[in-house]
């Protein structure tokens, strides 16, 4: 199947998209470097070891004030349209197309492969052609249990999501806000079936 034919999982409404902008999970209302230092302490408290970041600014801040993420998801732009240059592009690099307000089928598969590479000792970068925000969902769903996912909100919060079952279930609930036809596409995605969906 070519990239142009990959099904898209489209959030149904403004309300559904707005839910992803809420500071749920562990929200840190601080600017860097303070926000990163707090996240670091929480990582230690939760005994997390894998850092996954979603977003260019968060990825740069974590690398600057802590250490390089094991997995980062970036689109080389900020919300204001500023181009971000990442000098450390070594390691495994994936590219995926993901249009605004969508989740591509391919993003789940690439995220799973990315974590497999991380567990093999590689640093991984996923470069998104489009918008990376919603890839926080597969970043949580596909993450090993010792992972912490970090992403930023335009309201200024840094959000930390430990990859535990409770937060994975929350992400699955967000996915129920997809249109019916899109939910059928989602049901047929192997990565989501692994979390308990049954094909009908």
Swiss-Prot record:
Q: Which Pfam families match?
A: DUF359
Task: Indicate whether Kinase appears among the record's keywords.
Answer: yes
What GO terms describe the biological role, i.e. biological process, of this protein?
A: coenzyme A biosynthetic process
Q: Can you tell me which residues bind GTP?
A: 56-58, 75, 132
Q: In which pathway does it act?
A: Cofactor biosynthesis; coenzyme A biosynthesis
Q: Which domain of life is it from?
A: Archaea
- What is this enzyme's catalytic activity, as reactions? 3'-dephospho-CoA + GTP = GDP + CoA + H(+)
Annotated InterPro entries: GTP-dep_dephospho-CoA_kin
Give its E.C. classification number.
2.7.1.237
Q: Does the keyword Isomerase apply?
A: no
Keywords, comma-separated and alphabetical? Coenzyme A biosynthesis, GTP-binding, Kinase, Nucleotide-binding, Transferase
Q: What is an example of a GO molecular function annotated in this UniProt entry?
A: GTP binding
Its biological function? Catalyzes the GTP-dependent phosphorylation of the 3'-hydroxyl group of dephosphocoenzyme A to form coenzyme A (CoA).
PANTHER family tied to this protein: GTP-DEPENDENT DEPHOSPHO-COA KINASE, UPF0218 PROTEIN TK1697
Family the UniProt entry places it in: Belongs to the GTP-dependent DPCK family.
Q: What is the protein name given in its UniProt record?
A: GTP-dependent dephospho-CoA kinase
The source organism is: Caldivirga maquilingensis (strain ATCC 700844 / DSM 13496 / JCM 10307 / IC-167)
């Amino acid at each position: 199947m070519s990239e142009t034919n990959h099904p898209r999982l489209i959030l149904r409404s403004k309300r559904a998209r707005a839910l992803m902008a809420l500071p749920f999970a562990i929200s840190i209302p601080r600017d860097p470097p303070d926000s990163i230092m707090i996240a670091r302490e929480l990582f230690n408290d939760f005994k997390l070891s894998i850092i996954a970041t979603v977003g260019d600014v968060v990825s740069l801040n974590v690398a600057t004030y802590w250490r390089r993420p094991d997995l980062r998801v970036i689109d080389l732009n900020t919300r204001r349209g500023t181009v971000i240059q990442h000098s450390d592009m070594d390691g495994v690099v994936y590219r995926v197309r993901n249009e605004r307000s969508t989740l591509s089928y391919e993003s789940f598969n690439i995220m799973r492969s990315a974590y497999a590479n991380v567990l093999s000792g590689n640093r991984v970068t996923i470069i998104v052609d489009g918008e990376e925000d919603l890839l926080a969902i597969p970043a949580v769903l596909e993450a090993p249990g010792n992972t912490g996912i970090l992403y930023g909100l335009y309201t200024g919060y840094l959000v930390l999501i430990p990859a535990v079952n409770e937060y994975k279930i929350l992400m699955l609930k967000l996915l129920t806000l997809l249109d019916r036809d899109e939910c059928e596409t989602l049901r047929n995605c192997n990565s989501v079936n692994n979390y308990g969906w049954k094909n009908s």
